[in-house]
């Protein structure tokens, strides 16, 4: 079945509110119709108000880069999914390897966050991916499959069909190394196969799976040609308006 592609830029810890506003103003009017593709940027928490406001009359969607799994309470430094929804965010990125690595987030944390995000009417972009060591040991499919199963445990079939999964091999994030077209296809298919095993083929056929890891305008077309790659989660190439817009050339 045909799935609408989704291209999402992850700014990580970059841009102040003025830079975020300038970026949105530079890209918003040049984006293609939402009939063709969904386009989003994941802004740092300090930029979300500005980014959402700047994007509100355009087709650009806005993601938070993380949230907590409780709506309110004594959780210093955390971001409420309820407040993200009230602010007008569309997506929340969870489970990014940098969060898992630097902030010791577990599969259980990510599962709780996914449930909290859905409870507040937002859509999770759930990241998964293996280290170079796991990849070289030939255990990538097994490892990533376990991450996906754990992250989605207890969600409904309808919820899983509507979310986005982002496969990002850790060894390709910000390293300039990128997975081959075959690697990306095989792993995104493996992710989809896990969804099929856990929730049925119909759900697996609907869920969108992105590839991420050193995606740039020069290679995005190759990845998007893969039958099981439905989009890209893009870091460095999403920081400049021109390179971000160039990622959408795969549509031509």
Swiss-Prot record:
Subcellular location: Cytoplasm
Keyword presence, Acetylation: no
Enzyme Commission numbers on file: 5.3.1.1
Domain of life (superkingdom): Bacteria
Catalytic residues (positions): 96 (electrophile), 168 (proton acceptor)
Transmembrane annotation, as ranges: none
Record-linked Gene3D superfamilies: Aldolase class I
GO cellular component: cytosol
Coiled coil: none
Pathway: Carbohydrate biosynthesis; gluconeogenesis; Carbohydrate degradation; glycolysis; D-glyceraldehyde 3-phosphate from glycerone phosphate: step 1/1
NCBIfam families for the chain: tim
Assembly behavior: Homodimer.
Record protein name field: Triosephosphate isomerase
Provenance organism: Streptococcus pyogenes serotype M1
Gene responsible for this protein: tpiA
């Amino acid at each position: 079945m045909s799935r609408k592609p989704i291209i999402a830029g992850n700014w990580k810890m970059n841009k102040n509110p003025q830079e975020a506003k300038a970026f949105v103003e530079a890209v918003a009017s040049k984006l293609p119709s939402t009939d063709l593709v969904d386009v989003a940027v994941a802004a740092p928490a300090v930029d979300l108000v500005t980014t959402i406001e700047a994007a509100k009359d355009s087709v650009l969607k806005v993601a938070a880069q993380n949230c907590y799994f409780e709506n309110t309470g004594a959780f210093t430094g955390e971001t409420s999914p309820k407040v993200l929804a009230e602010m007008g965010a569309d997506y929340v990125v969870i489970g990014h390897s940098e969060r898992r690595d630097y902030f010791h987030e577990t599969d259980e944390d990510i599962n709780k966050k996914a449930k909290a995000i859905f409870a507040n009417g937002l859509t999770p972009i759930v990241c998964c991916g293996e280290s170079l060591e796991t990849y070289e040991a030939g255990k990538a499919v097994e490892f990533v499959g376990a991450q996906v199963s754990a992250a989605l445990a207890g969600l409904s079939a309808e919820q899983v069909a509507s979310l986005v999964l982002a496969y990002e091999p850790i060894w390709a994030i910000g390293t300039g190394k990128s997975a081959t077209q075959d690697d990306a296809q095989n792993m995104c298919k493996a992710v989809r196969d896990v969804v099929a095993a856990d929730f049925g083929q119909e759900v697996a056929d609907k869920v969108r799976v992105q590839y991420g890891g050193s995606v740039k305008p020069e290679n995005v077309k190759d990845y998007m040609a893969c039958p099981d790659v439905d989009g890209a989660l893009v870091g460095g190439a999403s920081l400049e308006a021109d390179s971000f817009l160039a990622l959408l050339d795969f549509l031509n």
